[in-house]
Amino acid sequence: MLTKSFIEFLYDAAHIQRWNEHIRPSGFTELDKQAHKMMIMYVLARHEEDDHGAQLNWRLLIEGGIFEFLQRNVLTDIKPQIFHEMMRVYGKELNAWVYQELRRRIPDIQEDFMEKMQLYFEYPQYCAMEKKILRAAHYLATKWEFELIYHFNEGIYGSEDTKAVIENELEDHYDLAAVKKLALKGKSSKFIDLVGQLRFQKRWAQSPRVPETSVMGHVLLVAIMGYFCAVKLGACDERIVGDFLCGLFHDLPEVLTRDIISPVKRSVPGLDELIKRMEERMVAEKILPLLPYTWHEDILYYTQDEFSNRVRIDGKVVHTSIEEISSKYNKPGFHAIDGSVLKGCDNLSAFVEVWLSRRYGITSKHMEEGERAIREQYKNKIIGGIDFGRVYDEFPIID
């Protein structure tokens, strides 16, 4: 499903403005909200496993998040209170229309994916705990946004009702371990605040673009593309989850250093390595202390050498090839990550950001050079069985 129609549909979420009936600062897009939600989901799920011994299906957590993202991308112009009431009364009919719209707007969408999506939405007891965690993550991401705009809207009709609705929904999720912890504004809450700042770091900051995208939205798109690549490679569930989470967290250090563009990193010999060492030190000092110690190894695994093909054997990181991962390590216990495929998704995301803006007639020298260089780099290129060259060929050259 790594096709032009699907990728363009994902980027539609970068156009959708949230809270547009409220006084608000800029930067609240549906894409960013969905990315923040998935990072919060990770925190909730890990705490639920650690504190309550929950047996969670991480692949279903990720797929559920993708299903809900696609659904909201079709329906999100509907005001939240109206949306939830419509789903309560006409949920089956609305979802049937969503499936129809997805098939119309993404002609090459895979039928087995659609069948899983229908199962997810039409059977309430299917993966009930995973749905509960995603629902809590949704309201926590919404609450994070609303707290930022609340003081702009105090006294405006309806703002107190909105606040009460969000708080009541979260109260219904207090049986989840992390929801209580987050309400106390402890370390986990500070982590969610910190990663939330990725919403405000703009990509291609030196150039005007439409749509504007943030580092936060970018990482979710890389994660989703990484998920579909892993499925195409026939990856086991653990490998699929690893590729998604690595895509989701690969730019986490940039919340501390900001998005240092590749030409700057390459401008001085050794500068790229220096930046990496600085990022590692700052992650250790600023991010890891906000998370339980038992999570540190995984966070470092997702953020260090993020684009290397690797597995973990007896607690040690071993660098390898995608071919060897597929033949020897495509099973639980090795925590395989297809780093070079994720690098391909990362570059594809950068390319599409520029291509979309130039299609709308907004361009710059930086964007023209960037689009040309990335397209040339991936001409006829296949990575681990993923034909990235074919994907680029679907995007026509803009003169």
Report the location of each language-model feature.
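Alpha-helical, largely C-terminal catalytic domains
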Residues: 1-399
